[in-house]
Design a protein with these regions (language model features):
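Surface-exposed, charge/polar-rich loops and edge strands
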Residues: 1-250
């Protein structure tokens, strides 16, 4: 059974209950859930989408939608990139349902960003530190993850013993911190945190909203698709190109 609970902003808590302890919530979603696809496809979800509407490198279940920029990367393309000496690193962001939520408020301050869970391996963070060239993010999911790393590092620079709750990136946090540090230093702070806690992977969450006025710290280039009007992803792109997104879309 599903029972609607407390209302929080434009969202609701929903309580799920079932009798069989051997059945997981993931099992229930597989049976009763429907894979969400972008509205611009103008069609219903098809059974084949479970296989074809996925990136070839996806491994961990948890997102409500595929990171669509990654759909363009076939095994052949990935092999060609590596043959050219381009290093490929993987990270995880579990895309939240809020990725489909348009901005309806008059001012961006009135939009509540969704929380997404991220995981980044120590080896990836170390490569970002040692890498002299561009860090190219594939998709806005990777952008949000990489940029969140910087702000996690800023938190650790202020408090090396920050709790898991304190490491979570809040929506407006990037715009409230004025004592900035170099990206390499921020990433080194994360490595120090992993060392102190005997961890190989950083697990946390982010509510970051990237909008015009945001100063990118780690991402130097990105691969992304076109985005819907009123989308927070369009704000992210606008911030990256300093408001010149109209030229790109024209």
């Amino acid at each position: 059974t599903a029972t609607r609970g407390e209302c929080k902003g434009t969202s609701h808590w929903v309580d799920f209950a079932w009798d069989n302890p051997e059945v997981t919530f993931a099992d229930i979603l597989e049976v009763f859930g429907e894979l969400p696809i972008p509205p611009y496809l103008n069609r219903d979800t098809e059974e084949s989408d479970k296989e074809t509407y996925q990136t070839v490198y996806s491994k961990i279940k948890g997102s409500v939608a595929a990171p669509t920029a990654g759909l363009h990367f076939t095994p052949r393309v990935l092999d060609a990139l590596q043959e050219k000496g381009i290093d490929l690193e993987e990270l995880t962001l579990h895309v939240g349902a809020g990725t489909f939520k348009p901005v309806k408020s008059e001012e961006i301050e009135g939009h509540e960003m969704h929380t997404e869970y991220i995981s980044v391996n120590r080896s990836t963070i170390k490569k970002l530190i040692d890498h002299d060239g561009y860090a190219i993010a594939v998709g806005t999911t990777s952008v949000r993850t990489l940029e969140s790393l910087y702000h996690i590092g800023v938190t650790l620079a202020e408090n090396p013993y920050a709790t898991e709750e304190e490491l979570r990136v809040k929506q407006w946090q990037p715009y409230e911190k004025y004592d900035q540090i170099p990206p390499v230093v921020a990433l080194q702070k994360i490595l120090g945190y992993l060392d102190r806690n005997g961890l190989e992977t950083l697990h946390t969450s982010t509510q970051i909203i990237i909008a015009p006025g945001y100063n990118y710290k780690i991402v130097k280039a990105m691969v992304t698709n076109f985005h819907q009007p009123q989308s927070t992803l369009l704000l992210l792109v606008s911030a990256f190109v300093k408001g010149n997104w109209h030229t790109i879309y024209d």
